[in-house]
Amino acid sequence: MAPSQLAWLLRLAAFFHLCTLLAGQHLGMTKCNITCHKMTSPIPVTLLIHYQLNQESCGKRAIILETRQHRHFCADPKEKWVQDAMKHLDHQTAALTRNGGKFEKRVDNVTPRITSATRGLSPTALAKPESATVEDLTLEPTAISQEARRPMGTSQEPPAAVTGSSPSTSKAQDAGLAAKPQSTGISEVAAVSTTIWPSSAVYQSGSSLWAEEKATESPPTIALSTQASTTSSPKQNVGSEGQPPWVQEQDSTPEKSPGPEETNPVHTDIFQDRGPGSTVHPSVAPTSSEKTPSPELVASGSQAPKVEEPIHATADPQKLSVFITPVPDSQAATRRQAVGLLAFLGLLFCLGVAMFAYQSLQGCPRKMAGEMVEGLRYVPRSCGSNSYVLVPV
């Protein structure tokens, strides 16, 4: 009796184990997340943010509507208000996709540089703090390209006025005109303007760099105004009406130029020792007979500063969410069912082999059966046991 009960218990345990393993095999293609039992009433389109179709495994086709509070409702796709809501949400999603938005990213902290000749202002003077004295302004080289003259033959034209370095009289200074140089030969004089772009290193050095510049420059080449006063007065702004209020730096025009072509030297070696933070751009403005400064600064061996444009990129807003409905794969589901069935059959085979081995081990040979007496046979209870059971033959 005991071996048979143990065998039945093993069979029941194996059966329940197989039922547990194969409980979901017949639902291999079922991916229905929301089961719709009741359809909802009409919902205003202003409260809806998204819709999607339910899965094919759900059986009854329905539209899943999602509200702003992320609640889901089932709706009948055949109703008119459901179709209008779907069109409204499709139009809203398409508009958001076309107008994805724009963000700008700054690559570095480079600020756009303004050409001094076209603006008429010096970048260093614009960036000067309010506490700067007039001495710093007078010692600062301007970035304005001075008006150059090209006298041909015996032509006499008044050059641009020079503040603080013009050899004209006070009456000519009040009128804004300098002395007229006379030349019998062909001469070409180019006004040299040294443009210094502002940097943090130049700002930190302060006025000591400008004092060093004044000490190293040669007096006959560049004449700097030596006025130093902390209070500005209208009398210091002497010159033509087109000149800026601060003092300008200009090379003095030589009156005697026997050569056919002469250009004033450019002193840039004092700016080369200022470190990597400061960049010196020597520029030579071509001569012209007009009284307006040249709009372009052309320098041999130097390029115009390039302004890096910010990078524009388009990106979808974070609120725009794309819901991808998974499509059930019939082949994968069939493959899973086949694997489960094979596993079930293999487990049954193993269980049968185990039961057969158990019965063969527990069985007793025929010689161990007792003798038959008067139609009754003595059968031992188990192999090797001394207790017998009388079995009628």
From Swiss-Prot:
Residues 153-172, 223-240 have a biased composition (Polar residues). A soluble short form may be released by proteolytic cleavage from the long membrane-anchored form. One of its GO terms (molecular function) is CCR chemokine receptor binding. The record marks 335-336 as: Cleavage. Residues 25-100 are annotated as: Chemokine and involved in interaction with ITGAV:ITGB3 and ITGA4:ITGB1. One of its GO terms (biological process) is negative regulation of interleukin-1 alpha production. Residues 114-184, 213-303 are annotated as: Disordered. Residues 25-337 are extracellular. Pfam families: IL8. Residues 101-337 are annotated as: Mucin-like stalk. Monomer. Forms a ternary complex with CX3CR1 and ITGAV:ITGB3 or ITGA4:ITGB1. Chemokine that acts as a ligand for both CX3CR1 and integrins ITGAV:ITGB3 and ITGA4:ITGB1. The CX3CR1-CX3CL1 signaling exerts distinct functions in different tissue compartments, such as immune response, inflammation, cell adhesion and chemotaxis. Regulates leukocyte adhesion and migration processes at the endothelium. Can activate integrins in both a CX3CR1-dependent and CX3CR1-independent manner. In the presence of CX3CR1, activates integrins by binding to the classical ligand-binding site (site 1) in integrins. Belongs to the intercrine delta family. This is Fractalkine. The gene is Cx3cl1.
